[in-house]
Amino acid sequence: MKRLVGGAALLVAVAIGGAYLNPYNIYDAAAEAGKSYVGSKACASCHEEEYENFIKYSKKAHSFHSVQLMRKELTSSELKECFHCHTTGYGKPGGFISEKQTPDLKNLGCETCHGPGSAHVDSEDASDILGKVDKDSCKACHNTDRVRAFRYKPMLYAGAH
């Protein structure tokens, strides 16, 4: 019995520790619940104005361009590290894999902040997607090591909200 309890405690500790070791692990729980990434174009049919503004005004919507500019100077592992903050869902079930395999996820999109959208697209139920996003959700990529001066509200509204 002690061995069983000890094993279970170790498993929980490893799972919790893994979440803290991977700061990009925000939406894994949602993906494990059967939700997958569908790409921002899937949002456009119901959220046309938000989508058009996002594509037109948000730098996030074109974030993969930065990766392409630096690609020649990066090792394979450095390039993959860029994918965490410059693509949608990289390293998560159904997320970005490569430009060829998942071209609709190669930039940051709606699901970067709102989580995997498949269930919401299918049901059109607001409870199937993360509606309100807070500043803490942004910290995995927008931190002092990466962004000199992160200003949440201007960035939020520049993201078409």
Region annotations inferred by a language model:
Residues G6-N22:
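Hydrophobic membrane-insertion alpha-helices, especially the h-region
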